[in-house]
Amino acid sequence: MAGAEGFQYRAVYPFRRERPEDLELLPGDLLVVSRVALQALGVADGGERCPHNVGWMPGFNERTRQRGDFPGTYVEFLGPVALARPGPRPRGPRPLPARPLDGPSESGHTLASLAEQFSPPESAPPILVKLIEAIEQAELDSEFYSRPELPAPRTDWSLSDLEQWDRTTLYDAVKGFLLALPAAVVTPEAASEAYRAMREVTGPVGLVLEPPTLPLHQALTLRFLLQHLGRVARRAPSPATAVHALASAFGPLLLRAPPPGGEGDGSEPAPDFPVLLLERLVQEHVDEQDTAPPALPPKPSKVKPAPTALANGGSTPSLQDAEWYWGDISREEVNERLRDTPDGTFLVRDASSKIQGEYTLTLRKGGNNKLIKVFHRDGHYGFSEPLTFCSVVELISHYRHESLAQYNAKLDTRLLYPVSKYQQDQVVKEDSVEAVGAQLKVYHQQYQDKSREYDQLYEEYTRTSQELQMKRTAIEAFNETILIFEEQGQTQEKCSKEYLERFRREGNEKEMQRILLNSERLKSRIAEIHESRTKLEQDLRAQASDNREIDKRMNSLKPDLMQLRKIRDQYLVWLTQKGARQRKINEWLGIKNETEDQYSLMEDEDALPHHEERTWYVGKINRTQAEEMLSAKRDGTFLIRESSQRGCYACSVVVDGDTKHCVIYRTATGFGFAEPYNLYGSLKELVLHYQHASLVQHNDALTVTLAHPVRAPGPGPPPAAR
C-alpha cells in the first residue's frame, strides 16, 4: 500500500442501493478508494488486493460521479492510481450482502424489488397476478410447472400480448418472474426460522413466514403464490405427487440459498431443504383449502321444526344406509367421483379431522367442488349455529328440497343428485364372465382410440408451442434490429446534412448522389424488416389461434378418456374378483401372453419365491441403487423399496431392458398402484397378484408382470447379456 495514493476497482456484479449512503453499481463501473480510507479501516499493506476480505469500502464511482459505500464482494482489484480522495466518514459495522451466485446478470433481465412493484392493499405484484389469473382462466395442470428446464430470461414484462400466450409460455413466465427478482422471496433469515420450526414445532410452518420474520411484500407474494400452487395440486389426479413436483420446481426459485446452519446441536439443513420447505407449505395450503371449509353464515330465524317422529329417533334412516354417505374416503376419490358432474351433485364423507360426529358435505357448484362442514354437538347437526337437525340424514333430506342460498348467496342450488355408493357396482351390467370380458374388449378399444387421438394432439400442441416460442424470439430480434437500424439512420441523417451542404458548396455531385443513395438503401432495408416483422406477427396470431383450438380439443377429450378408463378399470376389478384368469384378461385387452417362465410352470403356488419378502423387499434405498441392483437383469425382475413419498412404497421393475419405477400407495382400503386397485391387505398380497397380472392395466408402457424377485435364486441375466 506504500506509495500509492489510491486504488482502483471494477464492479463485477450489479448492486442496488440499500441505504442513502450506498453507491449504485453496474458491471464495469470503475471505483476509486483512497489509501487513507483503507488505513482507517485497518487494512494492512497488500490487503487492498483482496476487497472481498475488506467488507464495505468507501469510494468514488467514476461513472455516476458519486461517493458512498459499496460491498467489496462485488468488485475486483485493478491496481494503484495517483489520486487523492478525502478520507472516510465514520460509520458503524454492517453485514455484507450475499455475493451473487451465477456471475454478472444482464441489464434489463432484473425486475424491480417487490417493495417497488406493489403496495398493500394489493396482495401481490401486478405482473404475477396477471400471469396467474391467465393460467387459472385456462386450465390448471401441474405437469407444465414440473418441467425441469428453466425458462430463458425475459426482457419484456409489459404482458401486452398476454392473450396470445399458450400455456407453456404462461407457466414459464411465472418461473421467469421469480428468477428475475433481484432477491429471493424467502430471505435466508426467514428460511432459518422455518428450518427451526420444521425441526421443533408440530404446527403449521407457514405461520413462521409472516412479518416481521419475512418482510411484508415478500410475505404477501409468498402467500399469493402458495394459494395458487395449492389450487394446482388439488386439481391434479394425484395431489400428493403434484405437491412434490411443484415443490421441486419452485423451491429453488423461492429460496435461492440454503439457510445458515450452525444450530446448537450442530445440525445443518439438507441440500434439498428448499424443496422440503415448499412441499410442507404447499401441503398446508392444500389441507387448509380442503379440510377447513369456512363456516356458513348464521341461519335465518325461520326454520321448519323437525318432525316429531324424527326428533324422537323412531324413524330416522341409518346414516350407513344412505346412498350418498361414503364414510372414510380420501379427497382424491371424492374429486374423482364428482369430476364432470352437473351442479347440485353431492356426497358426504367423514371429516378429515377424524372427530366422531363431524362430516364434510362436498357439493358441485359452478364446475367446482364446494366443501361444507357438518357440525355436531349434543346430538344435533347443522352447517352453523343453531344446530337444529337430529341427524345427518335429516339435514341432507331437508336441503334436497330447500336451497342452500339461505346460508350463502353463491350456493343457490339444492342437493339434487346424490353420488350413490350402490350404483358403483351396477356399472357392470352383464352377468357372465364371458359377456363382461367381451364388453371390456369394447371399452378398452375405445379407450385406446381416444388415447391415440389425444397423443397426436399433444404432439401437435408441443410442436406448435415450440414454433410459437421461436417466432416470439424472432420478433424480439426484429425489434432489436429495427432499433439498431433506426438509430443508424438518425445518425446518418444528421451527418448527411453536414456532408451534403459541404459537397453542395464544393459542387461535388457524385458524392452527394452516393450519400443520398446510401440513405435510400437504409430506409428501404428498414421498411423490409418492418414488413417481415408484420408478416411474422400475423403468422404468430394465426398459429396461436390454432394452438388454442388444439388445446381446447385436448381438454374436451380428457373427460372421455377418464370416463372410459374408469369404466374399464371397474370391469377389470369385477373380472379379478370373479376369479378370471389373467391369461384370458390379457386376450380381451389385446396383450400378448409371453412364454411361460419358470415360476408359472410351478404347480404349487406356495412354492413361489414371492412368498418370501426377503427376496424382493430391500428397504430404504434410492432410485439409483435400485437401478444398480436390477442392472442386466431380465424383464420382470423387480424389487420393492421405501418411496421418497412419505407413507408410500415404490416398485422398481425391468421392462424392455430398462428399469421403471412406480409408486405403491397405502390407503384405508389397502395397498395398490392406483384407485380402485388399492385392495391388497399387504405388500405380499400385491406382489402375489401381480406375479401373474400385468402392470399394463395401470400404464400402457409396463407390459410386464412381477415375475422374478431380485434376490430369488434362479434366472440370471437375459440371453443377450450371457
Swiss-Prot record:
GO terms for cellular component: cytosol; focal adhesion; nucleus; phosphatidylinositol 3-kinase complex, class IA. The record marks 147 as: Arginine finger. One of its GO terms (biological process) is positive regulation of transcription by RNA polymerase II. Residues 324-419, 616-710 form the SH2 domain. Residues 4-80 form the SH3 domain. The modification Phosphotyrosine is found at residues 458, 599, 649. Residues 83-109, 287-319 are annotated as: Disordered. InterPro entries: PI3K_P85_iSH2 (IPR032498), PI3K_p85beta_SH3 (IPR035586), PI3kinase_P85_cSH2 (IPR035020), PI3kinase_P85_nSH2 (IPR035022), Rho_GTPase_activation_prot (IPR008936), RhoGAP_dom (IPR000198), SH2 (IPR000980), SH2_dom_sf (IPR036860). Phosphorylated in response to signaling from activated receptor-type protein kinases. Dephosphorylated by PTPRJ. Dephosphorylated at Tyr-649 by PTPN13. Phosphorylation of Tyr-649 impairs while its dephosphorylation promotes interaction with FBXL2 and SCF(FBXL2)-mediated polyubiquitination. GO terms for molecular function: 1-phosphatidylinositol-3-kinase regulator activity; phosphatidylinositol 3-kinase regulatory subunit binding; phosphotyrosine residue binding; protein heterodimerization activity; protein phosphatase binding; receptor tyrosine kinase binding. It comes from the Eukaryota. Residues 112-289 form the Rho-GAP domain. Keywords: GTPase activation, Phosphoprotein, Protein transport, Repeat, SH2 domain, SH3 domain, Stress response, Transport, Ubl conjugation. Residues 87-98 have a biased composition (Pro residues). The SH2 2 domain is required for interaction with FBXL2 and PTPN13. Regulatory subunit of phosphoinositide-3-kinase (PI3K), a kinase that phosphorylates PtdIns(4,5)P2 (Phosphatidylinositol 4,5-bisphosphate) to generate phosphatidylinositol 3,4,5-trisphosphate (PIP3). PIP3 plays a key role by recruiting PH domain-containing proteins to the membrane, including AKT1 and PDPK1, activating signaling cascades involved in cell growth, survival, proliferation, motility and morphology. Belongs to the PI3K p85 subunit family. This is Phosphatidylinositol 3-kinase regulatory subunit beta. It comes from Rattus norvegicus (Rat). The lineage of its organism: Eukaryota, Metazoa, Chordata, Craniata, Vertebrata. The gene is Pik3r2.
